[in-house]
């Protein structure tokens, strides 16, 4: 549920979002478009962060997760490898657990993106495709986006033609090249935008990116971390002559890489190291197609319509796996775990339909925005393996099937005297699982989930606002959890009768806004959010079905492979600060999270350490120059046992330990941007920077291995308009 927000700036509660009284806007004054009616981030009754095109360009990110790393409470999990990254919000999200992907909802232009596979990440894309990322932290977003969003929601927005076409231009070509020194990373990008009068515009973009394996601060090369990818976006927007917009878009990402580490993500070190699984050739293709129509019908309080149909398809083909020569290979005697190292194909295909309308009403001292919506999603999971003898068979640890969800939701935003905002909401969602014929099981599963919320925001004056909220959501068991019948050389029963995971989240906080504080025209915003998330009936692997010996017949258990085993709590505080003046700016984000298994009192290994992110920069407006320093100050893990340079065995680990260990570290970066607004270089843009200036050796707590050492970055682009 969303938090109750405190806002310091003038909280205009009209159909128009609140705005700064100054021309300059801080990152906390950016418009939030995914939490209901549009409003600025600091006025939103939920913890929300927004990344825009300027931030993406300045970061010169290689992978999408890099643009999120300064957000409080938001991390990437898995690794810095192209095939090994997924997301973590407030301690929720870990790619080595099949159920973690469903606890965070990820959308691209509204299309659902979901992928889960053993030892592989969950999101495959390129930051060059996007102009904006909205991260809504906490389960409040379940009302609008789907039950079970225990961690939150991440919305990616792709670029549009009108982002590049200036007034009077009918067409534009933008070429961009980038280089980074760790190691020999290259990007080539081209964007073509064309306007067809007042009727339509078209954008076509293509990107090619490659890199050798990167090195860490101490000079260690991370094996098979190199990559070669290409991606593209085509988007046609049609205008009906009034306010209606029909968009048709197609996005494609492709990477065909040889000799990649089989284990792209971490977890239990069952083989002594994550590289103990050997290498494999992987071809990953991700496709997204969206058709949407939006019309605000200005002047008609009964209509503000949004319609969408989308298709998402992610496939992974694995061939030529080395396994562990002489021990575990495709030629092994038993299906599991030897099938891991046979040629195999995995995939998820998701069709979605969504309709949403907002009804406005108002009186002398109140306004009301009632949003009603319907969402339907049909997801198909595929997986098959070709054994050494050439026989094609199903995968017991990656069962095929269909997952169908049908939901209705409403959210009402009631505003009194432009000061008090109350936002109740509820979602009713029906769920059906059906096993594929290859599973040998016929029993389906049906259930119903309820996701209610209530949020309150009160603006005391132009400086101070208070907010608070309560949200409940429920996560359905996944196909993997219900129909898996095999693991690490084990055979077990399907897990019928699993209960839904349930989350109850409470948030409260305040926001401060100041203007003309140190000089005329400056602004300062501070937003602080405290939260407590209580999670019940967590689904996990049945401890009574441990992995068997890989060198003998599989161990057979007459027990379900998954059960509701744990209860947990995650609580903490997040602080965001943004200051902007004519010649300098400052942004800060701090997060302190604690997560425990309330049954055993053990620390949760998915909760990242405390972190402070700072950015201090200068501006030369007439020259179009921005420059500055960024620092990340990350503490040691909450569990002292995991404060280590190497793997250790702590509570809840296998006998070999896990990749969940790290030490405290500080990382320093510098950046420079040049975007002249006039003169002979008007259409040129330069970005340069140095990441990890001091070549520090460090490891992110939620990653497999150490991160990148010192990296010099530069990109140059030029736009040609006509």
How would you label these PLM feature ranges?
Residues 223-225, 243-302, 314-324, 332-333, ...:
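Flexible loop and strand-edge segments within Gram-negative outer membrane beta-barrel domains
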Residues 111-139:
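Short acidic/polar hinge/loop motifs at secondary-structure boundaries
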Residues 15, 417, 422, 520-535, ...:
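Gram-negative outer-membrane beta-barrel transporters
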Residues 173, 177, 204, 302-322, ...:
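Membrane-embedded beta-barrel scaffold of Gram-negative outer-membrane proteins
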Residues 179-210, 219-260, 283-296, 364, ...:
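Transmembrane beta-barrel wall of Gram-negative outer-membrane proteins
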Residues 474-475, 534-537, 541, 621, ...:
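C-terminal beta-signal and adjacent terminal beta-strands/loops
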Residues 65, 69-111:
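Extracytoplasmic beta-strand/coil segments of soluble accessory domains associated
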Residues 241, 367-369, 375, 399-533:
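Structural signature of Gram-negative outer-membrane beta-barrels, strongest in the C-terminal barrel
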């Amino acid at each position: 549920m969303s938090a109750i927000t405190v806002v310091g700036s003038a909280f205009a509660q009209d159909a128009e979002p609140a705005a700064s009284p100054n021309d300059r806007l801080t990152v906390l004054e950016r418009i939030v478009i995914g939490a209901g009616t549009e409003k600025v981030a600091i006025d939103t009754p939920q913890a929300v962060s927004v990344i825009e095109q300027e931030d993406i360009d300045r970061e010169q990110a290689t992978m999408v997760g890099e643009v999120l790393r300064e957000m409080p409470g938001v991390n990437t999990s898995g690794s810095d490898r192209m095939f090994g990254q997924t997301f973590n919000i407030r301690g929720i999200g870990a790619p080595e657990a099949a159920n973690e992907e469903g606890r965070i909802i990820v959308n691209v232009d509204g299309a659902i993106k979901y992928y889960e596979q053993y030892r592989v990440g969950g999101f495959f894309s390129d930051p060059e495709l996007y102009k904006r990322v909205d991260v809504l932290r906490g389960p409040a977003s379940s009302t609008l986006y789907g039950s079970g969003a225990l961690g939150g929601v991440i919305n990616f927005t792709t670029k549009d033609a009108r982002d590049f076409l200036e007034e009077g231009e009918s067409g534009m070509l933008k070429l961009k090249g980038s280089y980074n020194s760790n190691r020999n990373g290259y990007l080539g990008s081209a964007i073509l935008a064309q306007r067809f009068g007042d009727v339509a515009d078209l954008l076509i973009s293509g990107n090619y990116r490659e890199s050798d394996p990167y090195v860490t601060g101490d000079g260690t090369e991370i094996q098979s971390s190199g990559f070669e990818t290409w991606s593209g976006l085509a988007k046609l927007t049609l205008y009906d002559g009034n306010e209606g917009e029909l968009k048709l878009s197609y996005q494609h990402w492709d990477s065909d890489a040889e000799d990649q580490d089989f284990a792209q993500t971490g977890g239990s070190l069952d083989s002594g190291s994550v590289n103990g699984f050997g290498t494999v050739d992987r071809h990953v293709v991700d496709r997204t197609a969206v058709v949407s129509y939006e019309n605000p019908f200005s002047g008609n309080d009964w209509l503000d319509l949004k319609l969408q149909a989308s298709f998402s398809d992610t496939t992974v083909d694995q061939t030529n796996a080395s396994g562990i020569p002489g021990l575990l290979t495709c030629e092994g005697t038993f299906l599991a775990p030897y099938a891991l190292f046979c040629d195999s194909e995995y995939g998820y295909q998701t069709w979605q339909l969504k309709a949403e309308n907002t009804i406005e009403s108002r009186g002398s001292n109140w306004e009301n925005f009632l949003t009603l919506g319907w969402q339907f999603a049909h997801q198909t999971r595929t997986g098959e393996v070709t054994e050494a003898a050439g026989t094609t068979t199903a995968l017991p640890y990656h069962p095929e099937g269909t997952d169908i969800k049908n939901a209705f939701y409403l959210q009402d935003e009631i505003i009194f005297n432009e000061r008090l905002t109350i936002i109740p909401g509820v979602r009713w969602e029906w769920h059906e699982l059906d096993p594929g014929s290859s599973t040998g099981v016929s029993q389906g599963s049906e259930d119903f989930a309820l996701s209610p919320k209530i949020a309150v925001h009160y603006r005391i004056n132009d400086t101070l606002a208070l907010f608070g909220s309560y949200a409940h959501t429920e996560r359905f068991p996944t196909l993997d959890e219900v129909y898996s019948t095999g693991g690490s050389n084990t055979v077990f029963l399907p897990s019928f009768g699993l209960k839904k995971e349930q989350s109850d989240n409470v948030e409260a906080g305040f926001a401060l806004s100041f203007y003309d504080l140190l000089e005329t025209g400056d602004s300062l915003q501070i937003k602080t959010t405290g939260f407590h998330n209580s999670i019940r009936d967590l689904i996990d692997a049945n401890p009574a079905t441990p992995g068997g010996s890989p060198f003998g017949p599989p161990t057979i258990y007459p027990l379900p492979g998954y059960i509701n085993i744990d209860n947990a709590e995650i609580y903490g505080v997040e602080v965001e600060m943004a200051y902007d003046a004519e010649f300098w700016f400052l942004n800060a984000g701090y997060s302190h999270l604690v997560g425990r298994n309330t049954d055993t009192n053990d620390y949760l290994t998915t909760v990242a350490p405390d972190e402070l992110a700072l950015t201090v920069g200068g501006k030369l407006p007439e020259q179009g120059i921005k420059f500055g320093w960024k620092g990340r100050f990350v503490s040691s893990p909450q569990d002292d046992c995991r404060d280590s340079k190497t793997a250790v065995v702590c509570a809840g680990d296998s006998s070999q330990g896990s990749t969940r260990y790290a030490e405290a570290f500080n990382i320093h970066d510098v950046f420079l941007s040049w975007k002249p607004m006039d003169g002979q270089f008007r259409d040129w843009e330069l970005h340069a920077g140095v990441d990890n200036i001091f070549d520090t050796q460090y490891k992110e707590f939620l990653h497999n291995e150490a991160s990148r050492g010192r990296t010099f970055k530069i990109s140059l682009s030029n736009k040609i308009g006509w």
